[in-house]
């Protein structure tokens, strides 16, 4: 998820979710991405996040947190210092599951880690990797065709076009444009942003994206949230994502507002 917090990523989120008051702070030791809307703190409609020295980030977070009613934060690898501070102030975390692929592995090992039935499906056709800004328009049309309507503003698509230009994203699509995905790359991480298909298997899209992210030097590829019970569609999507290998990681999620 760390790849989503570039300047363009934050601008995209504000186009998508509305204006936030930027309270982010940084120096040579750390960077804390945090914004305020009303009395709610988040990372511009995503979890608050820090890079670098957590102790410096905690001091900054404490100053910003004062007077806020609620917060959205993910504690990685157990209860970190900011998470402990939130628990001490009465906040209760819940587990958040996400699927992450280790791109330091070799390509043959990554292929072997996939579900056996996926290994052949991944080679069903040869997808194309694109960073051409104009291709965002073709992806937008596919998105509209699959959804039956336009689900977000033109400005969000314009921001993703800028992300392609800046090298912070890439598109993988089938030769026929019947399937495509958008992937966000930044800070050595790659995140599966969105994918759409008109019935064509998406397995080659994901496998090509994993290999391309590794080629770009990314060390991790995050497939996204894992849901194990409840909504059948979300459970099915999660099962599909797990088929590409990796491990299911647990973060502690503090989120006391919708």
Name each region found by the language model.
Residues 18-20, 66-69, 215-218:
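Short, high-confidence coil segments that cap the C-terminus of an alpha-helix
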Residues 52-55, 76-82, 137, 199-200, ...:
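Acidic-and-aromatic substrate-binding clefts and catalytic sites of carbohydrate-active enzymes
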Residues 53-57, 152-155, 201, 205:
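Soluble or luminal CAZymes and related metallo-dependent hydrolases
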Residues 1-39, 78-199, 212:
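A conserved beta-strand-loop-helix scaffold within acyl/acetyltransferase catalytic domains
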Residues 54-65, 83, 122, 157-161, ...:
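Short amphipathic alpha-helical segments and helix-helix/interface helices
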Residues 69-75, 130-131, 171-173, 220-224:
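A structural signal for short, well-ordered beta-strand segments and their strand-loop junctions
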Residues 45-84:
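A gly/proline- and charged-residue-enriched helix-loop-helix capping module
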Residues 31, 42-43, 59-64, 167-258:
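Aromatic (often tryptophan-rich) hydrophobic motifs at membrane interfaces
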């Amino acid at each position: 998820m760390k790849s989503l917090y570039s300047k363009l990523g934050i601008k995209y989120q504000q186009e998508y979710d509305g204006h936030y008051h930027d309270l982010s702070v940084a120096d040579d030791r750390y960077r804390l991405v945090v914004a305020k809307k009303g009395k709610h703190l988040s990372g511009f409609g995503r979890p608050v996040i820090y890079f670098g020295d957590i102790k410096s980030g905690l001091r900054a977070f404490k100053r910003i947190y004062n007077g806020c009613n609620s917060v959205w934060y993910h504690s990685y690898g157990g209860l970190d210092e900011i998470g402990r501070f939130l628990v001490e102030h009465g906040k209760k975390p819940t587990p958040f599951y996400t699927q992450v692929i280790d791109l330091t592995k070799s390509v043959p090992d990554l292929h072997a880690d996939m579900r056996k039935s996926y290994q052949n499906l991944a080679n069903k056709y040869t997808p194309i990797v694109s960073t051409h800004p104009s291709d965002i328009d073709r992806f937008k049309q596919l998105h509209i065709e699959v959804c039956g309507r336009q689900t977000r503003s033109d400005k969000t698509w314009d921001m993703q076009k800028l992300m392609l230009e800046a090298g912070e994203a890439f598109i993988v699509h089938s030769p026929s444009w019947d399937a495509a995905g958008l992937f966000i790359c930044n800070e050595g991480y790659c995140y599966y942003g969105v994918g759409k298909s008109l019935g064509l298997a998406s397995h080659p899209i994901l496998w090509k994206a994993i290999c391309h992210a590794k080629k770009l030097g990314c060390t991790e590829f995050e497939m996204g949230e894992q849901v194990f019970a409840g909504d059948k569609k979300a459970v099915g999507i999660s099962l599909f994502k797990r088929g590409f290998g990796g491990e299911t990681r647990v973060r502690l999620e503090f989120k006391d507002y919708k």
